[in-house]
Amino acid sequence: RESLASGHVIDITTTGRRTGEPRRIEIVFHNIDGRLIITGMPRADHKRAWLANLEADPNLTFHLKDAVKADLPATARVITDAKERRIIAEWVSANAWKGQDVEAMTAHSPMIEVTILDPVLA
């Protein structure tokens, strides 16, 4: 649980929406009031493959890889609600990526909420 208490660099493995093959990437998560949130830098011109994979299949593996190493089964919920996206963007801009453009993040950053399926950690 302590490893999930604050944001870290992690890996996630998704299932390729076209190939069905596992796809592992490195990414950062944030713990925002007990919610595990993954977001990326805003890009209006590009949809991330990992996000498209999670839209097709919300199951993923959340890989802790710092002091604690664990492969945690999880599910993702893509965050689409504008108010919810703005709250997350404001938190990230104030606490993690200082000064990031809140408007750009709200409009163009990928955002998902992760639910860990391991009952000990959930």
Where in this protein do the model-derived segments appear?
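Generic alpha-helix detector with strongest preference for long hydrophobic helices that associate
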Residues: 1, 10, 31, 35, ...
